């Protein structure tokens, strides 16, 4: 089985939270929004010239300082984020979008504020109350939370266009990324898969941690790759 053309590049993008594409987007004037939980509607964080980065803490060593602030009973992921934040590893963020879901992650986000891990003038941390039932009144509440805590903040602090047109554009781009990943994932169902589980995992991670507009061309190219591999394998089989 042949490795994907951009696999090494994708792996390099996962070595640091502020990877090459994040730096490129910010150099071009884009606003970087960090988040940690799937309860945050990712598409809304990619509205206008904003882009989302799902936070990780690669190359984490000791988390002793974060443990001092949070206690050793909190999960290691939450503490790793706080540790990296204290080290200055999230100075590249323009905002941190949190949700009131996991109490330990709430503690982590609170420490982002209390310890002032980011010194940018316009940096803010916001928390949203996420409903756990899907009924009409909770959906209405969810919409209000997104408007008040995300869209209004982005518009007021950074002048982001939060119109319905801008939202629909962000949703369209998000759906395109999801469609590509779904099609690539379906290739793993073949009798002789042309993509490994590891490769697919890497693709998923880069889609969460890189600006959508910059990673999308690489994902499109990757989608076409396994087709050529399939043709090559079929030719080799018939030759035998």
Which residues does each predicted region cover?
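Conserved small/polar residues in nucleotide/adenosyl-binding loops
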Residues: 230-237
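Extracytoplasmic substrate-binding proteins
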Residues: 131-229
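Trp/Phe/Arg-rich N-terminal binding region typifying the photolyase-homology
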Residues: 1-164
């Amino acid at each position: 089985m042949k490795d994907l053309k951009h696999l090494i590049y994708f792996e390099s993008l996962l070595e640091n939270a502020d990877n090459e594409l994040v730096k490129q987007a910010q150099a071009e004037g884009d606003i970087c929004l960090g988040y940690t939980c799937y309860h945050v509607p990712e598409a809304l964080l990619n509205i206008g010239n904003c882009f989302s980065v799902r936070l990780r803490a690669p190359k984490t060593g000791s988390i002793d300082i974060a443990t001092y602030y949070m206690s050793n009973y909190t999960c290691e992921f939450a503490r790793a984020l706080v540790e990296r934040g204290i080290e200055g590893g999230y100075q590249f963020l323009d905002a941190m979008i949190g949700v009131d879901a996991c109490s330990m992650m709430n503690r982590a986000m609170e420490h982002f504020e209390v310890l002032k891990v980011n010194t940018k003038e316009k940096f803010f941390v916001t928390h949203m109350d996420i409903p756990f039932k899907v009924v009409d009144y909770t959906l209405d509440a969810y919409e209000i939370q997104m408007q008040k805590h995300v869209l209004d903040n982005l518009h007021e602090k950074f002048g982001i266009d939060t119109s319905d047109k801008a939202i629909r554009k962000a949703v369209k781009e998000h759906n395109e990324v999801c469609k590509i990943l779904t099609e690539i994932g379906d290739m793993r169902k073949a009798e002789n898969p042309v993509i490994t589980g590891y490769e697919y995992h890497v693709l998923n991670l880069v889609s969460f941690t890189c600006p959508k507009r910059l990673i999308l061309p690489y994902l499109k190219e990757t989608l076409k790759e396994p087709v050529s591999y399939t043709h090559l394998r079929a030719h080799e089989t018939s030759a035998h």
